[in-house]
Swiss-Prot record:
This is Betaine aldehyde dehydrogenase. K(+) 2 binds at L246, K457, G460. It comes from Pseudomonas putida (strain W619). The lineage of its organism: Bacteria, Pseudomonadati, Pseudomonadota, Gammaproteobacteria, Pseudomonadales. K(+) 1 binds at I27, D93, V180. The modification Cysteine sulfenic acid (-SOH) is found at C286.
């Protein structure tokens, strides 16, 4: 019997059975254990969720800003009280180390919710004078029922990133988590209800993107879709959302981000940054800086520092807080990553570290891939051009600043970029020329609630987090008021 039994849908403030008996398995990628049987939503369930969300949204939007803010703050408190429990569930479901989920996933998700809870009373319109007897005022009104579609790498954090601004602005949200990692999002729905959110304002439908996701994106009474995932799927979601009813969309998609290390950089610090940009969360982060550019004359010294740090990685049971490198999210994804590693070897890249599946002892039960570093890479290699979404670093050399900027930008993606240098002028000069939406100087990876995140080119549309995201969950109504007489031309 599965450890967590059968997981139902969450609609209208409670768990309900799906309209069919179909389920899918939630699997612990560290051991292969079946954690739960998760029900698949039907099209009829989607209709129930939309109707429930419409009812709840009217109640929610009619509350005062302070009432909504207090409920969201209460949810923040509950998230923090249950942090360790939720973190362990996230570890079991995703394979991410508990040392990561305990201090990052729920913590940063709660921070975003707290940030938007504080902004609820700040949603304001404007007053625009026209003449002595007339003025215009604007209202920022909620969109209505919105949809969030999450990725498998940060399940509860992404659910909070999407629901926080949506709910703060007075909307309802129907959330569809990834089929691979659905469990913590259902717990989030419980927490919202416990905090006092009206029934229906946050519903969770589990199932495949091909079915449930499409039913949601095509639904005529959904006003906005926020999607996190791959670029190919994102294009389909965007086409579906726009062709059905011209929905607004936010897309956080793939990346193949460059990390440029300059000749004057502190090489130890640069190596530490490169490690975080490639191996945190076992390399399953959309913003990973997998193309590491190093001046040719510094390549050997940099390789030595990277190899030394890779040797210190503590791969193992993700439930052990001493572990800092767990398995990949699924056995299917492991095969995809191993395929890219094989391609890298075939195309002539040299393996500096790793390059294989970990199979010794308990590793054999899980989807573990060794932290892998390729060097002697060229821009035309598959591992350099395509998003792998795993623990695979590619080291490339360059000669001039102009050259490395051109090569860094030579990609269909534009999600993130970073520069390591002690020259502040050079740092800003390079960053301003890089075609990426999220950039770091002498750092990598932090995405605080206040920081808008999103991509250029085929890495996304719109932004999440920051004040600008809140505006994307409202629409402006303009009202002209005439205090004096009115003249007709007829």
């Amino acid at each position: 019997m599965a450890r967590f039994g059968t997981q139902k849908l969450y609609i209208d403030g409670g768990y309900v059975d799906a309209g069919s008996d179909a389920t899918f398995e939630a699997i612990n990628p560290a051991t292969g254990e079946v954690l739960a049987h998760v029900q698949r939503a039907t099209q009829a369930d989607v209709e129930k969720a939309v109707e429930s969300a419409e009812r709840g949204q009217k109640i929610w939007a009619a509350m005062t800003a302070m009432q909504r803010s207090r409920i969201l703050r209460r949810a923040v408190d509950i998230l923090r009280e249950r942090n360790d429990e939720l973190a362990m569930l996230e570890t079991l479901d995703t394979g991410k180390s508990y040392s990561e989920t305990r201090y990052v996933d729920i913590v940063t998700g709660a921070d975003v919710l707290e940030y938007y809870a504080g902004l609820v009373p700040a949603i304001e319109g404007e007053q625009i004078p026209l003449r002595e007897s007339s003025f215009v005022y604007t209202r920022r009104e909620p969109l209505g029922v919105t949809v969030g579609i999450g990725a498998w790498n940060y399940p509860i954090q992404i659910a909070l990133w999407k629901s926080a601004p949506a709910l703060a602005a007075g909307n309802a949200m129907i959330f569809k988590p990834s089929e691979v990692t659905s469990l913590t999002t259902l717990k989030l729905a419980e927490i919202y209800t416990e905090a006092g959110l009206p029934d229906g304002v946050f519903n969770v439908l589990t199932g495949s993107g091909r079915e449930v996701g499409t039913w949601l994106t095509e639904h005529p009474r959904i006003e906005k879709v926020s999607f996190t995932g791959g670029t190919t799927t994102g294009k389909k979601v965007m086409a579906s959302a726009s062709s059905s009813s011209l929905k607004e969309v936010t897309m956080e998609l793939g990346g193949k981000s460059p990390l440029i290390i300059c000749a004057d950089a502190d090489l130890d610090k640069a190596a530490d940054i490169a490690m975080m940009a490639n191996f945190y969360s076992s390399g399953q982060v959309c913003t990973n800086g997998t193309r590491v550019f190093i001046p040719a004359q510094m390549k050997a010294a940099f390789e030595a520092k990277i190899a030394e740090r890779v040797a210190r990685i503590r791969a193992g049971n993700p439930e052990d807080e001493n572990t800092n490198f767990g398995p990949l999210v699924s056995f299917q994804h492991m095969e995809s990553v191993l395929g890219y590693i094989a391609k890298g070897k075939q195309e002539g890249a040299r393996v500096l570290c790793g390059g294989e599946r970990l199979t010794e002892g308990d590793f054999a039960k899980g989807a573990f891939v060794a932290p892998t570093v390729f060097t002697d890479c060229t821009d035309d290699m598959t591992i350099v051009k395509e998003e792998i979404f795993g623990p695979v670093m590619s080291i490339l050399t360059y000669e001039t600043e102009e050259e490395v900027i051109r090569r860094a930008n030579d990609t269909e993606y534009g999600l993130a970029a970073g520069v390591c240098t002690n020259d502040i002028t050079r740092a800003h000069r390079i960053i301003h020329k890089l075609e990426a939406g999220i950039c770091w100087i002498n750092a990598w990876g932090e995405s605080p609630a206040e920081m808008p995140v999103g991509g250029y080119k085929q890495s996304g549309v719109g932004r999440e987090n920051g004040i600008s995201s809140l505006a994307q969950y409202t629409r402006i109504k303009s009202v002209q008021v005439e205090l004096g007489g009115y003249s007709s031309v007829f």
